[in-house]
């Protein structure tokens, strides 16, 4: 299981811990990932994804998973999210 958001592609970043005496030690900044089940209105079922807290807010802001995936770039999405995006597009075309 990778430490990467399935919707935005956010992953670990590197930087320094800096002490009061300005001593620097390397560290990793990990994304705030959560396992969530988002409801797809088009598919009529839940989709389990591992996404960041920022991505969850973005999904709510855009009006749900279907609207978020419609505007999302394919290169940012994981294989699972890309599969769901194609399922949604196919279901919307059939309806």
From Swiss-Prot:
InterPro entries found in the cross-reference section: Ribosomal_bL28, Ribosomal_bL28/bL31-like_sf, Ribosomal_bL28_bact-type, Ribosomal_bL28_sf
Entries under Pfam families matching the protein: Ribosomal_L28
Ranges where the record places region Disordered: 1-22
GO cellular component annotations of the record: cytosolic large ribosomal subunit
GO molecular function ontology, one term from the record: structural constituent of ribosome
Keyword line: Ribonucleoprotein, Ribosomal protein
Domain of life the protein comes from: Bacteria
SUPFAM superfamilies reported in the protein's UniProt record: L28p-like
Any one GO BP annotation for this protein: translation
Gene3D superfamilies xref list: Ribosomal protein L28/L24 (2.30.170.40)
Keyword Transcription: no
Protein family membership: Belongs to the bacterial ribosomal protein bL28 family.
Protein name: Large ribosomal subunit protein bL28
Organism name: Ruegeria pomeroyi (strain ATCC 700808 / DSM 15171 / DSS-3)
